[in-house]
């Protein structure tokens, strides 16, 4: 099972996104085995989708909520609880700045649920401690 990073959700949702086609190719191949979202990815999807600089046009909240609902109503979708922050996880040792906190937490959420995080952010996989790179799949 795969937890979709917000960059994958944005690319899937909005056809003007630069990664729209690779996101759909990945999703078409992998969604039958299931995919997940969590509160962190869902709220980030809402926030970023309402930013015209991110999606290329001005959208209203009703449009964005409808798109989010299309993900959550998909037959292969699961909602994963974020849970309490695991401050003892070894993945935190490689965090060097504020922009890596949410990424690391998403990896830990995926790990806790027995899955992996799927993203377009190749640097995320490289930052993980040795032996944990399998927790992230990068769409290329």
Regions found by a protein language model. Name each.
Residues 1, 84-96, 104-140:
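Acidic, PIN/NYN-like endoribonuclease modules and their adjacent C-terminal/linker elements
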Residues 7-8, 40, 122-123:
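Alpha-helix/helix-capping structural signal
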Residues 1-37, 49, 53-63, 129:
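Short, well-structured N-terminal submotif of metal-dependent ribonuclease cores
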Residues 37-39, 101, 119:
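Short beta-strand scaffold positions
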Residues 34, 76-78, 134-137:
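Conserved beta-strand segments of alpha/beta enzyme cores
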